[in-house]
Amino acid sequence: MALLLNSTMTVAMKQNPATAVSFMQTTCLGSSFSPPRHLQVSCVATNPSKTFRPIKEVSNQVTHTITQEKLEIFKSMENWAQENLLSYLKPVETSWQPQDFLPETKDEDRFYEQVKELRDRTKEIPDDYFVVLVGDMITEEALPTYQTVMNTLDGAKDETGVSLTPWAVWLRAWTAEENRHGDLLNKYLYLSGRVDTRHVEKTIQYLIGSGMDTKYENNPYNGYIYTSFQERATFISHANTAKLATTYGDTTLAKICGTIAADEKRHEMAYTRIVEKLFEIDPDGTVQALASMMRKRITMPAQLMHDGRDDNLFDHYAAVAQRIGVYTATDYAGILEFLLRRWEVEKLGMGLSGEGRRAQDYLCTLPQRIRRLEERADDRVKRASKSKPSVSFSWIYGREVEL
């Protein structure tokens, strides 16, 4: 029977994939199986290359730019990483878990009571906050992409999947810690009843399928500079959603966002420590790498966000985050200033080449230039738009939110 079924399925898939899906549902799952209405149409993509490509054009993809000399410098840090990097990880047994913040499922009556309390706390929170919180959660849920991309860094890869190099151990454990963030926010949002879960889930699938344009070039110098910046950005974002949740009266949600922010801060400390060490042993190469990443402009990891409807979903989500003060253009310049101070870029002297000194000069004046550009852009927006534009978000059942 199995052989006959496999043979029949093979022929059917070649002739008509949609028929094969229907045949499998009837034969393998029973004739009484009735999938949800939106799944009754063929689930086989008619044009996979178009369906699963990023919503925005990704160009100028460059790979493996690190020189052998720089690679050897990075590899020389392995003992240092073993002694200094892994200490930023927390033991699993003493780590918080999502269930610590969610309704208890063991007691049915208590569960329903706690869900009602959760819904009562969240029912008056404005839609714009939920748009930003959902966007933050979706960003966290794209964790498979981040681990995949980090595992492309030359000299820092987990070559076997169970490698015991400090870089591999860190990457797996960092991923495990980060995994709790999306899990917790996703469950809380689901229980709140305030969001259209299916459209949120579609966005997550689209985002993971689209990938991420980091411009790392497989270079660990670039990779750890990027993660230093991004962990700082996510720390700021989650800390601000925590403050707003307190303002709106949901102390549990505030604690959730604050706990996630604390994780991001610890991870920021780890990644900035790696780059600090790179500055110590190779200041010229590291300052040039930092300048290169800033010239390419470090972008948020969810830039390719899409829900199947809004081609500019990330920009709209980011605009709402800017308006309510969760993550702003001013924060971008502030993060750069913070990192330049942290790595003492202005104090670099001996050991810099001519190109290194030019990179240093560029970086030290960049925050001020970014702020000036932001001010001009804000002025143009204010002059051009007397009315307040709004956009419909599928995440909140198509309701409109001001940008």
From Swiss-Prot:
List, alphabetically, the SUPFAM superfamilies matched.
Ferritin-like (SSF47240)
- Effect of gene disruption? No visible phenotype.
Alphabetical list of CDD domains matching this protein: Acyl_ACP_Desat (cd01050)
- What start and end residues bound the annotated signal peptide? none
Its EC number(s) = 1.14.19.2
One Pfam match, given by its short name, reads FA_desaturase_2
- Annotated Fe cation 2 binding sites: E178, E231, E264, H267
Molecular function terms in GO for this entry? Answer: metal ion binding; stearoyl-[ACP] desaturase activity
Location in or out of the cell:
Plastid, Chloroplast
Keywords, comma-separated and alphabetical:
Chloroplast, Fatty acid biosynthesis, Fatty acid metabolism, Iron, Lipid biosynthesis, Lipid metabolism, Metal-binding, Oxidoreductase, Plastid, Transit peptide
Where's the transit peptide in this chain? 1-44
GO annotations of cellular component type:
chloroplast
Give the note describing cofactor binding and stoichiometry: Binds 2 Fe(2+) ions per subunit.
Q: Does the keyword Iron apply?
A: yes
The chemistry this enzyme catalyses reads:
octadecanoyl-[ACP] + 2 reduced [2Fe-2S]-[ferredoxin] + O2 + 2 H(+) = (9Z)-octadecenoyl-[ACP] + 2 oxidized [2Fe-2S]-[ferredoxin] + 2 H2O
Question: What tissue specificity does the UniProt entry give?
Answer: Preferentially expressed in roots.
| Cofactor(s) the protein needs | Fe(2+)
Q: For this entry, list what GO says about its biological process.
A: fatty acid biosynthetic process
Cite the binding residues for Fe cation 1: E140, E178, H181, E264
Please state which protein family the record places this protein in. Answer: Belongs to the fatty acid desaturase type 2 family.
Against PANTHER family, the record matches this protein to: ACYL- ACYL-CARRIER-PROTEIN DESATURASE-RELATED, STEAROYL-[ACYL-CARRIER-PROTEIN] 9-DESATURASE 2, CHLOROPLASTIC-RELATED
What's this protein's function?
Converts stearoyl-ACP to oleoyl-ACP by introduction of a cis double bond between carbons 9 and 10 of the acyl chain.
Q: What is this protein called?
A: Stearoyl-[acyl-carrier-protein] 9-desaturase 4, chloroplastic
